Amino acid sequence: MIKKLSLISLFTLLPASFYFAQTTVYAYVKDQEGKPVESAEIDLVQSTDDVKADKIGYFQFVDLQPGQYQINVSKPNFETKVIEFTVSANEKRRDLGVISLLPAPFANAGVMVIDDAASDSDEDGSSMQPTIGLLNSGRDIFQSVTAFELGAYWFRPRGVDNRYEDVIFNGVSMSKNDDGRVDFSNWGGLNDVTRYPYESVDNITPSAYTFGNLGGVVYYNTRASSYRKQTSLAYSFTNRSYRHRAMATYSSGLSKNGWAFTLSASRRWAEEGVIDGTQQNSYAYFGAIEKQFSSRHAINLTAFGAPTYRASNAPNTQEVYDLMGKNYNSYWGWQDGEKRNSRIRKTFEPIFMLTDYLKLGKTSNWTNTFSYQFGSDSRSRLDWFHGTDPNPTYYRKLPSYFFSKALELESDGGNDVTADELAEIEAVRNSWQTDSNVSQINWDALYRANYLNKTGMNGEKRGAIYTMVEDVNEDKTFNYSSHFDTMLQPNWKLNLNFNYQNLKSDNFRRVSDLLGADFAYNLNAFGGDNPYNVDDTNVEVREGDRTQYNYLLYRSSYAFNASTELDLPKWNVMGSIFSSYSESQRDGKYRHHYYLNTSKGKSGIYDALDGGVKGRVTYKIDGRNFIVYNGAFFSVAPTLNEIFVNPRVNERMTPGVSNQIINSNDLGYIHRGQVLKIRLSGYYTTISNSTDISRYYLEGGGDDNSAIGAPNAFIAEVLSGADKRYMGVELGLDVKVTPTLNANLVASVGDYEYTNNPKAYSYSDVDRTYFAADQEFGEANIKGLKVAGTPQKAFSLGLKYNSTKFWWLGVSANYLMDQYLDFSVINRTANFYTNPRTGDIYTATTGEYTGFDIPEANAENVAALLKQQKFDDQFMLNANAGKSFLIGKYRMGVSVSVNNILNNRDYVTGGFEQGRKSNFAASYEDNLNAEKGGYALFAPKLWYDRGTTFFANVYLRF
């Protein structure tokens, strides 16, 4: 009797919800033809209870408590559908019926194009990098719009550089060891197999597969059986960096004996892109083969690569654009009736991955991947030895130079420029616009110069004046990654990740074309004709030989990451920690004549220890409303390019280089309704102790006579210990006006700036007189200057009509604000306003060249000269449309997207100050040249938007 009473007492203490009938909710997922959508993912919002549809499209959730729920039903190539439902007390089973998924218009259209040509420039091109925001397009309205609409105009969410983003294939990071950036060209053109990531998290949200960085994680699982069984053919026509794209993809699905195959190939090509002289011929291939030994064990072999040949385009000063138009490109010239570009990027870095999938018990999985990547990345350019600069935009060849010379002749205070001088200037301008031998590279003249120089006065053989060379990077990277996950409890998940990577990077310059000469000299024309390698007595080099620099870089790293997620009725909590260790070393193969003791052989080892923590806390107000906090505090080890400041010539490590410290927080509100969806968030991020290095070629050198015999000096401007702050708010609204019409509004208001005055240095691989070795300039006065490379404010208003007849039409109005010019580091130091002859601040004087009055270099006058340029705000109009068809068992679709419909050519997508006039007097005189009616000789170099661009696509799937 006592036992019975005890049991009765125990049951009376149980919560009332225990007595409610726990409910099973089920449904069927089908496509527009009524066929089951196998493996559709059903996400029970803010819960770890996610399931997949089986072979007949069926899924169910069991033991749901009474309450309001929301599920997201998704599958690659289909639009995600959101379903809301209520579970009532005493309801044993709830039938949601048939959930129909429609083909995703953008998935079929292929209109999202990552222009990997943006990373080709070596003219301070770091501010012109694509971001993984372009890959992160399907999660919510804010990310979709910033990818498709604003991303086309180089908008970066939260101002985050590509350096702080992660793209992962099967546990292997695609970030390059030299600069930390993702090189999208390694898989460019493989849209069919990389369209849908396995995991995609934005910003600092913790990931299950890696700790990540500041700018989010995109994770791809290339398991062959994960791709939908089908054959896909597609052709695209566009006027962007290429004209044509053809793709073919085949996925076998999983056979009865456990085999699965996925193959994909593509080609992108153009005789000439929208920018003059930019031809392209790029291929890509992908193969994945999987063998399932049982339901618990499988292996998968993946291989992909993208052999790419692509011509680059140059940034120009405003004078050049005004002369020749926005599509002008100085890198090409006519040769034998064809356009030949001097700046060609050729890449082919295939990667092979072997992945083992093992299921342990009922709730644990262990995945291991071994990978090996190798290949070459080369970028060509013209080089010269005791010759004049062949670049048509060299400042002495421009009308502004002749205008400045005319001003010099009028230093007596009379008329600025005479009529005869104006006529001469006009003749120069006219020759630019009518004679391609003036406005473009004159290849015939280069061949002729080499031919006439083959033999000296005494009959001796002489080497080339002009050559084509390639800067080559050949990496060999081995990687091992391991991922383990387990459910500790039904609502508690644990992830463990380990990664080891080993890199050997071979870097050198190679002679690619002697331009008719018999050989070239491995001599420094700007260094007394001393050999670049004093240990080699043979200074003659021929096509295919290495020249000027030759060194290896080594890096090995180990990383461990653990993350956990706990789901509670009103809360969802996720935390992640990591630690990593890396070693980096340089091994020089040439003994440079300037650095006899520090150029050849192995350097010391630079080691770095990293660590950090991330967290996310979600409070579930109810089934539709959530408050989400993300926080992160971690360090980032410097890249190889940040460690070795001038590796072409010596082993010198960047002064003060050490780990960056990142502290980032954001707080957001999310509403997910049937009619209205809202995402509102605010963020605050600091990056401390960063090393920022701008590398570029300085045309000519340091003085007015250096055009003769001076190859382009390779300059490194260094900011050591820079602090930056990023803060702002983001808003995304999606309103279902009618069942077929959606309206969306996206706003991003940011403020990104430098918050301290770091140390500045400058290095050159050629000229020790103008840029002395290890030259320190003291503090750079950059506090308060804006971070360049992205509009800091952006707005988009869009409408999209989805017809029940399987066609759609979308339009968006976009407004971009607060885009800034990248600044010259040296111009922000005391060197700028200090007279090198006296060591004092410049006093009021008469111009050395023009004879005009130059004021004192006081704070007001210096600030006026160095004010950071802010570009004008711009409006862009985009549209897209498409339709899909069913023809028997075949699915066909056509689509077209048009960006910048109004052909706005005033939008500056990026630019940088030149560092040639790095003192107050010279800079003031240069600006006077513009004020008197000409142009500044060393004005900023800019990139402009390409105007109206389109992308048309047709596909066939069966």
Model-derived features with residue positions:
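Acidic/polar loop-and-plug regions of large Gram-negative outer-membrane beta-barrel proteins
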Residues: E290, A298-T355, S378-V469, G528-R542, ...
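A beta-strand signature from Gram-negative outer-membrane beta-barrel systems
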Residues: I99, G188-A234, R245
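Transmembrane beta-barrel wall of Gram-negative outer-membrane proteins
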Residues: T23-Y26, S232, F237-W269, V274-N313, ...
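Signature of Gram-negative outer-membrane beta-barrel scaffolds
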Residues: T467, K493-D622, E642, P647, ...
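Surface-exposed extracellular loop regions of Gram-negative outer-membrane beta-barrel proteins
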Residues: A311, P315-V320, E540, E583-Y594, ...
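C-terminal beta-signal and adjacent terminal beta-strands/loops
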Residues: I687-N689, Y815-Y849, D853-A857, K883-F958
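Periplasmic N-terminal accessory/gating domains of Gram-negative outer-membrane beta-barrel systems
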Residues: F85-P206, R268
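Gram-negative outer-membrane beta-barrel transporters
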Residues: K570, Y684, A713-I826, N953-R957
